[in-house]
Amino acid sequence: MALGKVLMAGWALCMALLLATLAGAVGETRYDKFLRQHVDYPRTFTLAAHRYCETMLARRRVTAPGRPCKPTNTFVHAPARDLVAACSQMPDAEGFHSTPTAMGLTACRLRGGNTRPPCTYQARQLQHHVRVSCVGGLPVHLAGTYAPLQ
């Protein structure tokens, strides 16, 4: 009887470990989510250029039916390695790392009062430095952008 309980407990532990491993394998890491939400390199061509933000936010599952519209989102049109390189830069007083050079990006800002889809955005093309927070040497959050010093 005791052996049966030990075997059952061992089997349950193995199943729990297997499920945890599978969940991690199919789950999205914070870095993967950062890439999905913020990196568009090379810049995606959209037939209606003025609809770039709506198209990309829906395609990248940032906005979706039943979820509130995201007030702002930025797509960086540079290789992911350039944003990873920012993590090796000295952090600022707030703990954010900045890209050493300005890069092309599209800043999307929600227009009107819609808080639920359909979401309508204003797009601005900019050349800005990008501020990120990093974990394990990888960017996981886009904290903001700023214009190069003149």
Q: Residue locations for each model-derived region?
A:
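N-terminal "domain-start" segment
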Residues: A2-T99, L110
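Acidic, glycine-rich flexible loop segments
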Residues: E94-Q127
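Compact beta-sheet-dominated globular domain cores
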Residues: N114-Q150
